Amino acid sequence: MKQENIISTTEDLKKIVNKALKLDAVGLDTEFVWERTYYPQLGLIQIALSDEECYAIDPLSIKDLSPLGELLADRNTIKILHDAPQDLIIMSQATGATPQNIFDTRLAAGFAGSISTISLLQLVSEQLETELDKSETRTNWLKRPLTEKQLSYSLNDVRYLRATRVILLSKIIGPKIKSWLQEELNLLNNPANYSTIADESRYKKVKGVNKLDRKSIGVAQEIATWREQKARELNRPRGHVIKDDILLEIAAIRPTRPEELANTAISTKAAERYGNDICQATARALNKKEVDLPHQQKRSQLSSQEKGALAQLKELITLKCDILGIDPALLGNSNELKKIIQTLYKGKTTHMRQSFGWRKEFLKDFYQIHRDTI
């Protein structure tokens, strides 16, 4: 690996970004370590201006990554990544920029006759008949100096992105399917993807929360939101603040005084450190009106008629996707397809991605037929 391929100063980064901004598209990728922190620790950023001109940007040496932010936010130059969301979040956090004009080769593969969950290794092999070396997947990207093998591995992750994009676009059947892909890609431009505001729906990911009564679920929601903010503030994993099972224990007893936490498995140290915060979160939940409390997310069973409709929906998606060269998984997972049927038959009003945009267009005939027969 040539030394000039490593970018370790803001001045050199500016030069590379200025070259990138004159191009129609560049490849981007990151290498990071994510073990004992809330946020991934950025170890390397790779950029491909062409198949031959690739650079490794060292964020441990460069304190000012704002030039990279300028490239990320630029609406003219396409930034090509594979499985883009996590890399974009990391680079957005490092630069403060909101990414714009993104092309995700993993997503695009699902519109081009392949699967939307394909790895870069598989995709490059499938589309370019080139084998990538993945022996450095578990390497420590924070350790310096990086070896020649590490640098070669990292740059090969961006080297083929531009060519892969061209091939994928050539395999998409017609302008309508391309517009559907672009609609999906446009979602990556949304600033909400990169927000640092704690998500109030995080409690839903706590296993077992639906076994609680409604008031306790409200407490779990408030504590989970507080925990998210605290984990970000400390840059520690959520479980280092409070583990999920302890969070559920606390929510079940709804403590209003710190000493009540002695009835749970929370450590003495954590109770002393976070007791007041936990009780304040509990109080916020208990002060809510019944109508403002979250509901239990119970799984309802489908009737035999609904099961028949679900089977028809899956068959329609499979057949239509086969004709159009689209991965059926892009239309929705099993729970989403079940919700479609429940919405049609039970009149449930749930916000679904299948109720707008290209998915609604794809499924419009099915919707019409079943609305007419119910």
UniProtKB/Swiss-Prot annotation:
GO MF annotations in UniProt: 3'-5' exonuclease activity; nucleic acid binding; nucleotide binding; ribonuclease D activity
What cofactor(s) does the depicted protein rely on? a divalent metal cation
Q: Does the keyword Nuclease apply?
A: yes
Key words of the record: Cytoplasm, Exonuclease, Hydrolase, Nuclease, tRNA processing
EC number in record: 3.1.13.5
Q: Does the keyword Cytoplasm apply?
A: yes
Q: Which residues span the membrane?
A: none
Name its GO BP terms in alphabetical order. Answer: tRNA 3'-end processing
Q: Which reaction does it catalyse?
A: Exonucleolytic cleavage that removes extra residues from the 3'-terminus of tRNA to produce 5'-mononucleotides
User: Where does the record place the 3'-5' exonuclease domain?
Assistant: 6-171
| Subcellular location, record wording | Cytoplasm
Instruction: Provide the HRDC domain boundaries.
Output: 213-292
What EC class is this?
hydrolase
A GO CC term? cytoplasm
User: Entry's InterPro entries?
Assistant: 3'-5'_exonuclease_dom (IPR002562), HRDC-like_sf (IPR010997), HRDC_dom (IPR002121), HRDC_dom_sf (IPR044876), RNase_D (IPR006292), RNase_D-like (IPR051086), RNaseH-like_sf (IPR012337), RNaseH_sf (IPR036397)
Pfam families recorded: DNA_pol_A_exo1 (PF01612), HRDC (PF00570)
Q: What is its main location?
A: cytoplasm
SUPFAM superfamilies on file: HRDC-like (SSF47819), Ribonuclease H-like (SSF53098)
Please describe what this protein does. Exonuclease involved in the 3' processing of various precursor tRNAs. Initiates hydrolysis at the 3'-terminus of an RNA molecule and releases 5'-mononucleotides.
Family listed? Belongs to the RNase D family.
Tell me what this protein is called: Ribonuclease D
Q: What organism, scientifically named, is this protein from?
A: Desulfotalea psychrophila (strain LSv54 / DSM 12343)
